[in-house]
């Protein structure tokens, strides 16, 4: 079906931060399957572990205990504030799970009041109907009305707008059951959450007995220079969702929760493929290799290098670049609307053998593999410099 505007290219192989097309042209990959290929392409350890797993068992369903799933669950909970995990196959599924969880929590605690879920303007939570309804971008929702009701939207990083919604719901016999929000808005324009905002958000959720669930589909698993995006904010959520980088290019999603939010019972929710042995082995390998190779430190260092390079580009091309923002290896250059657009720059980068991806607000988004090297960041910056010189 015609659901993608694709580049007219097919890649035949990849290694680390590089991809090769059928003609042998090499591309530096600063997209990483949209923040997904954490260990890069064709990682030796991941390849070996998954080859071994294929010779054992791939899928049996959640009718039975799954050793790899149990190992992954222990690993994730030992490394985070969460105590329990539900596994699925994607970010949209993980966020659908979170929405169902918030709704059930509300029905248990709201004492008959209408249940409301808060989400942020410019957010992105997925393409399935509930996740789409929670997404604060009308351009994605157009044509799919009526959306699921019960969502209200606040301005990201603006606590006054959150407080106003809590007060309005209180006066209208409604109850905010939970808040679903990204620690750093990816599709919305690579906008990091502020510590002050999230501290206030945590406090008001506690005051009103509302769940705070973070969408870490794009920010989790080391992407920001911390293992979890919430670690940059000085708070702990009641739960958070993962996907993308968790599987290193293999389909897996997860909803992790503290005990307070561990309210699903058998039959409440399920996934046929969720947490299958193959996907869990991929995720276990990604987490283990991130720890073994100290990849989080690389993300921090390369993020600092990238940010410094963006600062230099901003000074050199002030008419083109109006700002930079991001954390670790999820960063964006804000392009001046009057001069160029991010899609045009994406196309020019493609011609020069550099893969980047646009984000909202006319932003060129950079989300390379977490293993990208110092030399490769310099190549990336040189290619961007060349593009801006030609504009």
Where in the sequence are the language-model features?
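Conserved N-terminal phosphate-binding loop of PLP-dependent enzymes in the Aspartate aminotransferase
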Residues: 1-391
């Amino acid at each position: 079906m015609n659901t993608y505007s694709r580049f007219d290219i097919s890649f035949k192989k990849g290694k680390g931060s590089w991809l090769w097309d059928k003609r042998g042209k090499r591309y530096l990959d600063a997209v990483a399957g949209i923040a997904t290929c954490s260990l890069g392409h064709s990682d030796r350890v991941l390849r070996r572990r998954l080859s071994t797993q294929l010779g054992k068992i791939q899928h049996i369903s959640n009718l039975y205990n799954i050793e790899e799933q149990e190992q992954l669950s222990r690993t994730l909970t030992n490394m985070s504030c969460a105590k329990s995990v539900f596994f699925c196959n994607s970010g949209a599924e993980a966020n659908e799970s979170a929405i169902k969880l918030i709704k059930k929590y509300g029905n248990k605690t709201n004492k008959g009041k209408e249940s409301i879920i808060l989400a942020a303007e410019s957010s992105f939570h997925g393409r399935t109907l509930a996740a789409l309804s929670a997404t604060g971008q009308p351009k994605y929702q157009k044509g799919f009305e009526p959306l699921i009701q019960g969502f209200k939207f606040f301005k990201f990083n603006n606590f006054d707008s959150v407080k106003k919604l809590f007060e309005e719901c209180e006066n209208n016999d409604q109850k905010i059951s939970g808040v679903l929000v990204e620690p750093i808005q990816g599709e919305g324009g690579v906008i990091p959450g502020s510590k002050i905002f999230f501290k206030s958000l945590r406090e008001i959720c506690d005051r009103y007995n509302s769940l705070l669930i973070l969408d870490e589909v794009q920010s989790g698993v080391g992407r920001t220079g911390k293992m979890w995006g919430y670690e940059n904010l000085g708070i702990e959520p009641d739960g958070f969702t993962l996907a993308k980088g968790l599987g290193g290019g293999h389909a897996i999603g997860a909803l992790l929760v503290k005990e307070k939010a561990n309210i699903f019972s058998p039959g409440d929710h399920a996934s046929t493929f969720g947490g299958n042995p193959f996907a869990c082995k991929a995720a276990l390998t990604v987490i283990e290799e991130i720890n073994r190779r100290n990849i989080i430190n690389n993300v921090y260092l390369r993020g600092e290098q990238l940010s410094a390079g963006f600062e230099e580009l901003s000074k050199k091309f002030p008419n083109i670049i109006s700002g930079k923002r991001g954390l670790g290896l999820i960063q964006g250059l804000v392009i001046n609307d009057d001069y160029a657009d991010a899609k045009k720059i994406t196309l020019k980068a493609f011609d020069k053998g550099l893969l980047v991806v646009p984000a909202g607000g006319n932003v060129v988004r950079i989300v390379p593999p977490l293993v990208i090297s110092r030399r490769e960041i310099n190549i990336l910056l040189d290619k961007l410099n060349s593009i801006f010189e030609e504009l």
